[in-house]
């Protein structure tokens, strides 16, 4: 009876020992960049790999094969990817890709690379000579497949639970979570509509991404239409916004807005590419943009109190971005006509911050263009986030003209400016914890009826604290805020006027103080604000 158990123990030990071998330490890789002049890097050399302590490092190579001529594209270090585990040689196995890619483990293992497509024919099985089977042989041949299969299942489950998706793949479980999240958002009930399954069509070409490995790293946000990932594109971080297929219309709308002539601006989110990934029912639609590590203005204000100069910088660059978005530019930098665009979901969550706190406008999924001689497209009235909806939107009494939509954006800007002031330490008084507009009045999840009662019927607005008005700059800014969220839409300021006012207020205050606390109320009148004739 001991022989079977001894054989089983021997077999299991050999399997475990085999799994412990093969992991080669990767410290350095061969480096090469065919686009070194354009990207301002070295052309070739050695690259030292750096990563997290519990992550594995690899080397990779990518190349083209044009009629038998090998054209090297990239070589270097590659992050933790289970497709590269225990590969001592750099071998590409795809049949006929546009760009070949291989990865391996071990120092300088990418010095040599090769293409070896997986064989399509049946495997050749070794048949031992017909001998009388012994008990040990029967046990070995019976338990070997079972043990190997068990190890594979356990390893696959562990990888699924602990590893990030490799290049070109997305965790479907995460995507379904995004879809469920999108259906529960604080917005209009009709903002999440399933669409019939159909191919969204080819996205515009994105050669920048097509030639470079893209690796998803972690989910940074869940929004109206899906998830936003932090990803790595070679040595740069990018943001990847992933839409499920039923939100194809939002993906197409945002892609079209980004593709509009003149959309390259320092205060608008930089667009990199739009792509379709997957097939059949697992199709995903990707928007790839610049990544900003400080995140949204909402997140930043939750964790940080800001100075007077920081407030002015964010407010000025934010209003500059919205002013440019609203502007109609007949001939923009040789790109063609840039039409006026209304954002329609302006809020602090959709304002991102660069490292120097320069504001960048994002999320153009609900934006609408106003081109001469063309209908503006879907101008459904009640869209956006409820608590930022203007009174006329809550009432359903919108004039479907360009200026009406721009004034709706300006009401929301007034609320975002209030959020900035509420977290500024310039005034001589306490700085409260961060709160969303109307959170103090009607909580974190207001209904449409509650907002109609507070905003439309009672004409209430977020509270302006008395001690804010004792600082000359904040007092003038509060006047500007009140003129942005005016109940009369036609009386609201334009984004360009807000930008000019903030600049003027900052210069006037900083001309006499250096971000210090000023308590003279009379000094508020020292600077004349721009007249309301500057409104839209």
From Swiss-Prot:
Keyword Magnesium set for record: yes
Gene3D superfamilies for this protein: CD59, Phosphorylase Kinase, domain 1, Transferase(Phosphotransferase) domain 1
Pfam annotation, one family: Pkinase
GO cellular component term, pick one: receptor complex
GO MF entry, a single one: metal ion binding
GO biological process: anterior/posterior pattern specification; artery development; blood vessel remodeling; BMP signaling pathway; determination of left/right symmetry; embryonic foregut morphogenesis; gastrulation with mouth forming second; heart development
Cytoplasmic side: 159-536
Domain Protein kinase residues, every copy: 214-504
Annotated transmembrane regions: 138-158
Disulfide bonds: 29-59, 49-77, 84-103, 90-102, 104-109
Region of interest (Interaction with DYNLT1), residue spans: 515-536
Cofactor(s) named in the record: Mg(2+); Mn(2+)
Membrane topology, from the record: Single-pass type I membrane protein
Enzyme Commission number(s) from the entry: 2.7.11.30
Entry's localization field: Cell membrane
InterPro entries: Activin_recp, Kinase-like_dom_sf, Prot_kinase_dom, Ser/Thr_kinase_AS, Snake_toxin-like_sf, TGFB_receptor
Carbohydrate attachment residues: 42, 65
Extracellular side: 19-137
Function: Transmembrane serine/threonine kinase activin type-2 receptor forming an activin receptor complex with activin type-1 serine/threonine kinase receptors (ACVR1, ACVR1B or ACVR1c). Transduces the activin signal from the cell surface to the cytoplasm and is thus regulating many physiological and pathological processes including neuronal differentiation and neuronal survival, hair follicle development and cycling, FSH production by the pituitary gland, wound healing, extracellular matrix production, immunosuppression and carcinogenesis.
Assembly and binders: Forms an activin receptor complex with activin type II receptors such as ACVR1B. Interacts with VPS39. Interacts with DYNLT1. Interacts with BMP3. Interacts with BMP2. Interacts with BMP6.
Family: Belongs to the protein kinase superfamily. TKL Ser/Thr protein kinase family. TGFB receptor subfamily.
Protein name, per record: Activin receptor type-2B
């Amino acid at each position: 009876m001991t022989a079977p158990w001894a054989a089983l123990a021997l077999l299991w030990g050999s399997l475990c020992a085999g799994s412990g071998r093969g992991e080669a330490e990767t410290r350095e890789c061969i480096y090469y960049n065919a686009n070194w002049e354009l990207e301002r890097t070295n052309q070739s050399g050695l690259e030292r790999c750096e990563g997290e302590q519990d992550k594995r490092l690899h080397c990779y190579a990518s190349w083209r094969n044009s009629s038998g001529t090998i054209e090297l594209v990239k070589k270097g270090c590659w992050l933790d990817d289970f497709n590269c585990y225990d590969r001592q040689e750099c071998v590409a196995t795809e049949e006929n890709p546009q760009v070949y890619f291989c990865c391996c483990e071990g120092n300088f293992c990418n010095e040599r690379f090769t293409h070896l497509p997986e064989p399509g024919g049946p495997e050749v099985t070794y048949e031992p000579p017909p001998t009388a089977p012994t008990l040990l042989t029967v046990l070995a041949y019976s338990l070997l497949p079972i043990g190997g299969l068990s190890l594979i299942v356990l390893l696959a489950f562990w990888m699924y639970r602990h590893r990030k998706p490799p290049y070109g793949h997305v965790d479907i479980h995460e995507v379904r979570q995004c879809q469920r999240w999108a259906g529960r958002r604080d917005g209009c009930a009709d903002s999440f509509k399933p669409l019939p399954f159909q191919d969204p069509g080819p996205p515009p070409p994105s050669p920048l991404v097509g030639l470079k490995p893209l690796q998803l790293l972690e989910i940074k946000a869940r929004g109206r239409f899906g998830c936003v990932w932090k990803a790595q594109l070679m040595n740069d971080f990018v943001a990847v916004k992933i839409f499920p297929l039923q939100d194809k219309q939002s993906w197409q709308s945002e892609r079209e807005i980004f593709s509009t002539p003149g959309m390259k601006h320092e205060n608008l989110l930089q667009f990199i590419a739009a792509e379709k990934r997957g097939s059949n029912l697992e199709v995903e639609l990707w928007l790839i943009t610049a990544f900003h590590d400080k995140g949204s203005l909402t997140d930043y204000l939750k964790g940080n109190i800001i100075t007077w100069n920081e407030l002015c910088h964010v407010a000025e660059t934010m209003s500059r971005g919205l002013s440019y978005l609203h502007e109609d530019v007949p001939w923009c930098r040789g790109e063609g006509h840039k039409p006026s665009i209304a954002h329609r979901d302006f809020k602090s969550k959709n304002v991102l911050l660069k490292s120097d706190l320069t504001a960048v406008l994002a999320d153009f999924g609900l934006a609408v263009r106003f081109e001469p001689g063309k209908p503006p497209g879907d101008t459904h009235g009640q869209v956006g986030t409820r608590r930022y909806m203007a009174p006329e939107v809550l009432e359903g009494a919108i004039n479907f003209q360009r200026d009406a939509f721009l004034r709706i954006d300006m009401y929301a800007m007034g609320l975002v400016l209030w959020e900035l002031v509420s977290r500024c330490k310039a005034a001589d008084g306490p700085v409260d914890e961060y709160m969303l507009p109307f959170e103090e009045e009607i909580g974190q999840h207001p209904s449409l009826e509650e907002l109609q009662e507070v905003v439309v019927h009672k004409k209430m607005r977020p509270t302006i604290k008395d001690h804010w008005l004792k600082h000359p700059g904040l007092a003038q800014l509060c006047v500007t805020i009140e003129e942005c969220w005016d109940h009369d839409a036609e009386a609201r300021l334009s984004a360009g006027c807000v930008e000019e006012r903030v600049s003027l207020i900052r210069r006037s205050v900083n001309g006499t103080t250096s971000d210090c606390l000023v308590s003279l109320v009379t000094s508020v009148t020292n600077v004349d604000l721009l007249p309301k004739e500057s409104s839209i």
